[in-house]
Every structure is written in structure tokens, then in C-alpha cells.
Amino acid sequence: MAEGQEEHFSRTQRLKAAVHYVVGSLCQEVADDKEIDFSKQAIAAISEITFRQCESFAKDLEIFARHAKRTTINMDDVKLLARRSRSLYAHISKCSDEIAANSLEQKEKKKKKSVSGGNVSRNSDMDTVVPESKD
């Protein structure tokens, strides 16, 4: 096996192990809450299905971005991916709106800081703020 293939296989195995761990943890939480048990085979099957679905999502997201002549996946691609599930689409849209609002707030805060704090010096005798000239 070539070195690149070995690295890819190793990375895939680590991702599968991580997915299996998370699925196992979630199944344990549900089992504790609902007082039921999950067999190891059920957890393994859920893990495998989850991993394959994530692979499918990743490929679709890459294709959506490539179709739009971009190399970066953005929120519109994720929304397009979730279009078939109304509840998932609504949740992703809500999260997207929150992220956009937070991003806008951060930009406004930075803008205010640069406008008010960037070109100001203090006059120590009178303790007043004097704007510096931009000459």
C-alpha cells in the first residue's frame, strides 16, 4: 500500500473511531434516560450509518461549492444540503441567522473602536480627550 493510502486509511479509521465513541456516548445517555439498553451491534450499526451519511454530506457539500465555482463551503451550501428536512432546515437557518447577527455585531464593535479609539490622545494637564490631526 502506498504511503498516501496508508495515511488516508489511518485517518479514516480514526474518524470512524471518533464517530463510534460519540454514538456510544449518546446511546448511553438515551439508555440512562429511557431505561433501555443498546446492544454493541446496534451501536456499531448506528455508527457505521452515521459515518456513511457524513461522507455523503461531505461529498454533496463539496459538489455544491464547486458548482458555485468556489473552493470554500459556506452556509448556503449547508442550507441546500438540509433542504429535504424541514425541521433541520429551520434549525440550520436559525443558527445561520444568529451567526450572521453576531458577526455583524462584532464588525460594528470593531468599527466603533477604530473610529473612537484610533486617533485620540490625552492631554494630561486638563484630562481631556483631544483628537489628533491626520496631517
Swiss-Prot record:
Q: Which UniProt keywords apply?
A: Cell cycle, Cell division, Centromere, Chromosome, DNA damage, DNA repair, DNA-binding, Kinetochore, Mitosis, Nucleus
- Which biological process terms from the Gene Ontology are attached to this UniProt entry? cell division; DNA damage response; DNA repair; replication fork processing; resolution of meiotic recombination intermediates
Instruction: Please provide, in alphabetical order, the Gene Ontology terms of the cellular component aspect for this entry.
Output: FANCM-MHF complex; Fanconi anaemia nuclear complex; kinetochore
Question: Does the entry feature the keyword Zinc, yes or no?
Answer: no
Disordered as annotated region, ranges? 103-135
Cite the InterPro entries for this sequence: CENP-S/Mhf1 (IPR029003), Histone-fold (IPR009072)
**Which GO MF term does the entry hold, naming one?**
protein heterodimerization activity
Q: Does the keyword Chloroplast apply?
A: no
Q: Which SUPFAM superfamilies match?
A: Histone-fold
- Identify the main location: nucleus
Q: Where in the cell does this protein reside?
A: Nucleus; Chromosome, Centromere; Chromosome, Centromere, Kinetochore
This molecule's function is given as: DNA-binding component of the Fanconi anemia (FA) core complex. Required for the normal activation of the FA pathway, leading to monoubiquitination of the FANCI-FANCD2 complex in response to DNA damage, cellular resistance to DNA cross-linking drugs, and prevention of chromosomal breakage. In complex with CENPX (MHF heterodimer), crucial cofactor for FANCM in both binding and ATP-dependent remodeling of DNA. Stabilizes FANCM. In complex with CENPX and FANCM (but not other FANC proteins), rapidly recruited to blocked forks and promotes gene conversion at blocked replication forks.
The UniProt similarity line reads: Belongs to the TAF9 family. CENP-S/MHF1 subfamily.
Self-association state and partner proteins as the record states: Heterodimer with CENPX, sometimes called MHF; this interaction stabilizes both partners. MHF heterodimers can assemble to form tetrameric structures. MHF also coassemble with CENPT-CENPW heterodimers at centromeres to form the tetrameric CENP-T-W-S-X complex. Forms a discrete complex with FANCM and CENPX, called FANCM-MHF; this interaction, probably mediated by direct binding between CENPS and FANCM, leads to synergistic activation of double-stranded DNA binding and strongly stimulates FANCM-mediated DNA remodeling.
Please report the name of this protein according to its UniProt entry. Answer: Centromere protein S
This protein's species is Xenopus laevis (African clawed frog)
